[in-house]
A protein has these predicted regions:
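Protein kinase catalytic-loop region centered on the HRD/HxD motif
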Residues: 116-126
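AlphaC helix of the eukaryotic protein kinase fold
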Residues: 42-61
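Activation segment signature within eukaryotic-like protein kinase domains
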Residues: 110-111
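AlphaC helix of the protein kinase catalytic domain
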Residues: 92-102
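A short, aromatic-enriched beta-strand patch in the conserved N-lobe beta-sheet
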Residues: 72-74
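Conserved beta3-strand ATP-binding lysine motif
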Residues: 36-41
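C-lobe/activation-segment region of protein kinase-like
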Residues: 146-194
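Conserved short submotifs of the Hanks-type protein kinase catalytic core
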Residues: 77-92
Length: 247
């Protein structure tokens, strides 16, 4: 099969372009995929080519329902080397907000799914560009939320600043979604505001504490439950020790 038969219906999607990349949709062997290639002014620069290869290496093994999957890295006629991802047919959060179509149900789904994706990214020690409404897609078929660009750098350990920046981005996106959808959930508004508090304040320390807040489980309540459980165990052990016959 010739390259032209392998790749058909290649179309540029300028609204999805990124800082260093152009994004295309195409058919590969008849199957719809998306292509991500360096902008023409960067294609001959070895540093940018290395950056692209590094992004592929980092993202290839990621597997999460709220992150667009990478399938391959190969040369496409007329475009050069491309990162090939699953086709994501849908609308960006930015466009949904701008068109006034964001619903309360979508906002509640966003609050949970976006946090799940961020937690997964952090578990894999990935440092990335800030997540923005432009890089979040609601798929057209089932309305699933997916992040289309999570960055390309992987560290042995994330710093507290990396985690804080992720949660700040999460808070900003959630607050904009709440305002756009008219969602009046006091809990979601409180979570968004705490994520955006000035550094050094009482921000959430990690995604797990944010998750607890979303589910209405306060840290203090968890500590009380743990202490009560430990006290009960000590009492039970003491009772059994007292009941033991003395030889």
């Amino acid at each position: 099969m010739s390259p032209t038969e392998k790749w058909t219906e290649i179309e540029h999607l300028p609204e999805w372009d990124e800082e260093f990349y152009e994004v295309y949709t195409a058919r590969k062997h008849g199957k719809w995929v998306m292509l991500k290639t360096l902008r023409p002014e960067f294609r001959d620069n070895p540093d940018f080519r290395a950056m692209m290869e590094r992004e592929f290496d980092v993202r290839y093994n990621l597997c999460h329902p709220n992150i667009v999957m990478i399938n391959d890295f190969e040369e496409v006629p007329g475009l050069g080397m491309c990162i090939i991802t699953d086709d994501v047919y849908g609308t960006s959060l930015r466009k949904v907000i701008d068109e006034g179509k964001l619903t309360e149900e979508m906002t509640r789904k966003l609050a949970v799914n976006l946090l799940d994706a961020i937690a997964y990214i952090q578990q894999n020690h990935i440092v990335h560009r800030p997540i923005r409404p432009e890089t979040i897609i609601f798929t057209q078929d089932i309305g699933n939320m997916k992040i289309i660009d999570v960055g390309f750098d992987q560290h042995e350990q994330l710093t507290p600043a990396d985690i804080t920046e992720d949660l700040e981005s999460y808070g900003k996106i959630l607050q904009e979604a709440l305002d756009a959808s008219g969602c009046q959930s006091q809990r979601l508004h409180a979570v968004a505001q705490r994520c955006m508090r000035p550094r050094g304040g009482s921000r959430y320390r990690d995604t797990e504490t944010v998750r607890n807040a979303l589910e209405g489980r306060s840290e203090k309540r968890l500590y009380v439950i743990i202490i009560a459980f430990l006290a009960l165990m000590v009492a039970i052990l003491g009772w059994f020790s007292w009941r033991q016959p003395v030889l």
